[in-house]
Regions:
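Active-site catalytic motif of lipid deacylating hydrolases and related acyltransferases
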Residues: 2-63
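Conserved alpha/beta-hydrolase fold motif
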Residues: 69-70, 95
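Catalytic histidine-centered segment of alpha/beta-hydrolase-like enzymes
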Residues: 47-49, 163-175
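Short beta-strand/loop motif that positions the catalytic acidic residue
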Residues: 125, 130-133, 137
Length: 181
């Protein structure tokens, strides 16, 4: 059976089109071994977590077998929030979080997006979890990755250089790990 990936886009006007390049790159790198499902999330310009949560749940339910979840930027933080609040309808074979904002950091205080107090324990049944971030990310500060690393030592941290917020539209490192799952 093919591996099935659910890729959740970032937020903001034009994010779906921008992240489509990431999803397409990942599909090209993985070839016929995987299917990358890339749904357009509701109201990308003014994201509401509840609407995205419902869409994530619906898309996750149509996957066959184990799911691999990937989120970019706001999509990464919404994947994390979803997994801390809900029991996924499918077994999760891996989680890949790209340029995830740490909600609650200075100038990033959005209560609706923040994780609960005991969010780390929610991931005890889900492994592996990878966090990727480029040191030169111009949207989400690299310090957000450091905050996750401090609070979430079980996560596998991948620090990249010169890739920016969109990873130069190249997810080679992510694809290499997915091939091993």
């Amino acid at each position: 059976m093919k591996k099935q990936l659910l890729f959740i886009q970032g937020g903001g006007q034009g994010a779906y089109a921008a992240d489509l390049k990431l999803a397409a790159n990942l599909q090209a790198l993985l070839g016929f071994e995987c299917d990358v499902l890339y749904p357009k999330m509701p109201d990308e310009g003014r994201p509401v977590y509840g609407a995205w949560k419902a869409r994530i749940a619906a898309d996750l339910s149509v996957l066959e077998g184990e799911a691999i979840l990937i989120g970019h930027s706001l999509g990464a933080s919404f994947v994390m929030k979803y997994l801390t609040e809900e029991k996924p309808s499918k077994p999760v074979a891996g989680v890949f979080l790209l340029a995830a904002p740490y909600w609650g950091a200075e100038d990033w205080e959005v209560e609706e997006y923040a994780l609960g107090e005991r969010w780390v324990s929610a991931f005890s049944d889900i492994q592996p979890i990878y966090l990727y971030h480029s040191r030169d990310d111009e949207i989400v500060p690299f310090t957000h990755l450091e905050r996750y690393a401090e609070r979430f030592p079980e996560a596998i941290i991948r620090k990249l250089d010169g890739r920016g917020h969109q990873f130069n539209n190249d997810l080679f490192e992510v694809a290499q790990v997915i091939k091993t799952l």
